[in-house]
């Protein structure tokens, strides 16, 4: 079924919404944990359920390489395969056009890209991307796009934009012919406002179920990220979900909500957890620091996650000191719980009309 989006309340530009999907309802704004290979690193589906995750992201390109479409179809899609009953959004593989650009070849047909697993060259087209995402059975499919790298010239950014539009048309036609999965179009345009405006006009003219802002948070300065987002958001329809691709820092999330964005994803909370960094309501914490050697308090006194209910800073520091994977797992649980709690508090603050106050509290500790 195609998604249904309800805009429940606004507080200035901040939006409180609800997305109805085949595998459940998603309350927005919300953060999506990233499960690239059909798992969120160091988390079981039960862990994700307990922290309150509503929807997760998986990556079509990586799942195409392993386990492959045959295995996914054998399991009737990713939900049965990984034992996750809630909604899933899949990245089309467009980001790999950016991240695996060494040796790639881009044509109107698609992208010839090197597999990070065995070095073989794979031709990814919009049609193949849709076929992969159909075999995955995701609730939300992303159109295949060209995510341009920072520093790209205006001339080259035009080429990337035109390919993104062409591939969006082909993605939409392809997925509509094979399934009733919902699909989001992606606005590109690099860091050029005239191209952002053109891309938004072209992509929103198509019958997508939602829209994403792509090509940002890829290494540019923070001010540029916000400037481009603030410029782009008003160009998107109010009656459809808005997804910013690649936002995981608490500061960025509250700033994007303030601009009218609904959905976010990033590996940041899980990646920093594996390196000993906790996200708390008083800012970041390096639990490997010597000052926590004898500290019997939880990571965050305000947190109700499994980790904070059961373990001390001292113990988690010890686990990292000895290289025990359990330390990474416990911090991953905590960080993702924090992101879900942040999302929930954002929703409550929009409902209650005090979002600016909450945003101010977050910005006080995350600069």
From Swiss-Prot:
Region RNA binding, annotated ranges: 270-274
Record-level GO cellular component terms: cytosol
Pfam families: TGT (PF01702)
Enzyme class (EC, first level): transferase
Catalysed reaction equations from the record: 7-aminomethyl-7-carbaguanine + guanosine(34) in tRNA = 7-aminomethyl-7-carbaguanosine(34) in tRNA + guanine
Annotated positions binding Zn(2+): 303, 305, 308, 334
Cofactor note: Binds 1 zinc ion per subunit.
SUPFAM superfamilies reported for this sequence: tRNA-guanine transglycosylase
Active site: 91, 265
Keyword Acyltransferase among record annotations: no
GO terms, biological process: queuosine biosynthetic process; tRNA wobble guanine modification; tRNA-guanine transglycosylation
InterPro entries reported for this sequence: ArchSynthase1/Queuine_TRR (IPR050076), TGT (IPR004803), TGT-like_sf (IPR036511), tRNA_ribo_trans-like (IPR002616)
Entry keywords, A to Z: Glycosyltransferase, Metal-binding, Queuosine biosynthesis, Transferase, tRNA processing, Zinc
Bridged cysteine pairs (disulfide): none
Pathway in which the depicted protein is active: tRNA modification; tRNA-queuosine biosynthesis
Keyword Repeat in record: no
Record: residues binding substrate: 91-95, 145, 188, 215
EC number: 2.4.2.29
Entry GO MF terms: metal ion binding; tRNA-guanosine(34) queuine transglycosylase activity
Cofactor annotation: Zn(2+)
PANTHER family named among the record's database cross-references: QUEUINE TRNA-RIBOSYLTRANSFERASE (PTHR46499:SF1)
Complex and partners: Homodimer. Within each dimer, one monomer is responsible for RNA recognition and catalysis, while the other monomer binds to the replacement base PreQ1.
Family: Belongs to the queuine tRNA-ribosyltransferase family.
Primary role: Catalyzes the base-exchange of a guanine (G) residue with the queuine precursor 7-aminomethyl-7-deazaguanine (PreQ1) at position 34 (anticodon wobble position) in tRNAs with GU(N) anticodons (tRNA-Asp, -Asn, -His and -Tyr). Catalysis occurs through a double-displacement mechanism. The nucleophile active site attacks the C1' of nucleotide 34 to detach the guanine base from the RNA, forming a covalent enzyme-RNA intermediate. The proton acceptor active site deprotonates the incoming PreQ1, allowing a nucleophilic attack on the C1' of the ribose to form the product.
This protein's name: Queuine tRNA-ribosyltransferase
Species of the source: Thermosipho melanesiensis (strain DSM 12029 / CIP 104789 / BI429)
Lineage: Bacteria, Thermotogati, Thermotogota, Thermotogae, Thermotogales
């Amino acid at each position: 079924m195609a998604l249904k989006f309800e805009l429940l309340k606004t507080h200035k530009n901040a939006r409180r919404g609800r997305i109805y999907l085949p595998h459940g309802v998603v309350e927005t704004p919300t953060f999506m944990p990233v499960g690239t290979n059909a798992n969120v690193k160091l988390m079981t589906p039960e862990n994700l359920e307990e922290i309150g995750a509503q929807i997760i992201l998986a990556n079509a390109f990586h799942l195409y390489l392993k386990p492959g479409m045959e295995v996914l179809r054998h399991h009737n899609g990713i939900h049965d395969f990984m034992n996750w009953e809630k909604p899933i959004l899949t990245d089309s593989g467009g980001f790999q056009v950016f991240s695996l650009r060494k040796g790639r070849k881009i044509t109107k047909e698609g992208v010839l890209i090197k597999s990070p697993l065995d070095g073989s060259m794979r031709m990814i087209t919009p049609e193949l991307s849709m076929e992969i995402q159909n075999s995955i059975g995701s609730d939300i499919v992303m159109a295949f796009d060209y995510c341009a790298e920072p520093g790209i010239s205006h001339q080259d950014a035009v080429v990337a934009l035109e390919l993104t539009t062409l591939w969006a048309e082909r993605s939409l036609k392809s997925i509509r012919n094979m399934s009733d999965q919902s699909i989001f179009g992606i606005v590109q345009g690099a860091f050029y406002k005239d191209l952002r405006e053109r891309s938004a006009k072209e992509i929103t003219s198509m019958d997508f179920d939602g829209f994403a802002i792509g090509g940002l948070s890829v290494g540019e300065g923070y001010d540029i990220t916000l400037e481009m987002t603030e410029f782009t958001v008003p160009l998107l329809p109010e009656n459809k979900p808005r997804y910013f691709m690649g936002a995981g820092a608490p500061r960025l999330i509250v700033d994007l909500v303030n601009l009218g964005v609904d959905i976010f994803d990033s590996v940041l909370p899980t990646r920093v957890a594996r390196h000993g960094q906790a996200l708390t309501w008083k800012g970041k914490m390096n639990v490997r620091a010597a000052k926590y050697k004898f500290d019997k308090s939880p990571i965050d006194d305000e947190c109700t996650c499994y980790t904070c209910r059961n373990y001390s800073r001292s113990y988690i520091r010890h686990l990292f000191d000895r290289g025990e994977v359990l330390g990474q797992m416990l911090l991953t649980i905590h960080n993702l719980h924090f992101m879900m709690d942040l999302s929930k508090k954002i929703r409550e603050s929009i409902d209650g009309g005090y979002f600016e106050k909450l945003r101010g509290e977050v910005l006080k500790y995350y600069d």
